[in-house]
Amino acid sequence: MLMLLSPSKTLDYETPATTDSFSIPEFLEKSSELVKVLKQKSFLDLMELMQVSQKIAELNVERFNQWKLPFSTENAKQAVLAFKGDVYTGLDASALSENRLTYTQSHLRILSGLYGLLRPLDLMQPYRLEMGLKLKTKKSENLYQFWGEKITDKLNVLLAKQDNPVLINLSSNEYFKSVQKKNLDGRLITPEFKELKNGKYKMISFFAKKARGLMVRFAIDHNIQKAEVLQNFDYDGYHFNLELSQVDKWVFSRG
């Protein structure tokens, strides 16, 4: 079983890492190609490309200009500890023991516009580059074209090592478009999280994001190896809703 998350825009490079263990991203050569393009952009270019404020654009001009190889614990941080959005609030990786971080390294991957596919302990330098951006390079019109088959091929290598290859998609639509799901060599399961509001079950983005992280944490806490066991997920009042679920679309609801 392999779980897949989106990254977050919010980053934390102030809090010291809670582990000395780390790995190096596998697509750094491709990341370097993107950074080379991004270093040529002004803050005005980034404001238009990313649709962000001048302050955020200037911050990312600085980030891309400071981005350099090789990565070390002096100039980079483990991805699962650096990301700090709603998903990662639910995951709360800084509270994980070394053994549990080892589990994440085998069972979790994080999609990234800049790094392609990250292991949780992969070192990364700070950036902002959403997968849906139309960043042009010499050979591609956008990041989906840039990454092409690479992310899917890597996921297939990982799935091939499993007895029952299953990918649990806990990423957003924007990021999962970078995966060519028709070419996946395994079963694809997409959990959804819904709240009961005015007599109807609805997906509310803030709660759903946190729940994705909570599901990963549930898998870590219970050392889950088989996807079906995730149907026991019960953190924060959620439960598996058989009535709303389909074969490969599992709905968890509360309220």
Predicted segments with their positions:
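Active-site helix-to-loop segments that bind/position phosphate- or nucleotide-bearing substrates
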Residues: 4-95
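Internal, well-folded beta-alpha domain core
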Residues: 93-246, 251-255
